[in-house]
């Protein structure tokens, strides 16, 4: 007799539990009610997450890369054509063939390091043969003829 009685109490407990749960669901007193976020845009923007600082166990590159464009690499050679000589005499300008990757600022710095002269401005152009030509205009306190003589152009 006792096993039948136990089954009845289990059933009534289960039924009571189900009724309790149904009542809780209907009334809406659940703990984890998810709130719907209203989307105002069609596109989804990924939220910014935590980014930790890199702390590598060992360096991935063993040696630091050397500077491939130093002043000796930038200035290849001075031009000694008739038109370049005319520029030296008339416009206080030196003419150089320079590396194709060098920009005006790098050319200016290279001329300053190599020949200890101040430049007023630098004009560049790419020649049809693919090399870069630089017209380096010197400041009035330097004479291009003297500098050209010191370099060995004249």
From Swiss-Prot:
GO cellular component, one term: ribonucleoprotein complex
Annotated Gene3D superfamilies: 3.30.70.330
Leader sequence residues: none
One GO biological process term: translation
Presence of keyword Ribonucleoprotein: yes
Keyword Ribosomal protein: yes
Keywords from the named record: Ribonucleoprotein, Ribosomal protein, RNA-binding, rRNA-binding
GO molecular-function terms, A-Z: mRNA binding; rRNA binding; structural constituent of ribosome
InterPro entries given in the database record: Nucleotide-bd_a/b_plait_sf, Ribosomal_uL23, Ribosomal_uL23-like, Ribosomal_uL23/eL15/eS24_sf, Ribosomal_uL23_CS, Ribosomal_uL23_N
Recorded family membership: Belongs to the universal ribosomal protein uL23 family.
Function, as annotated: This protein binds to a specific region on the 26S rRNA.
Protein name in UniProt: Large ribosomal subunit protein uL23
Organism (species): Daucus carota (Wild carrot)
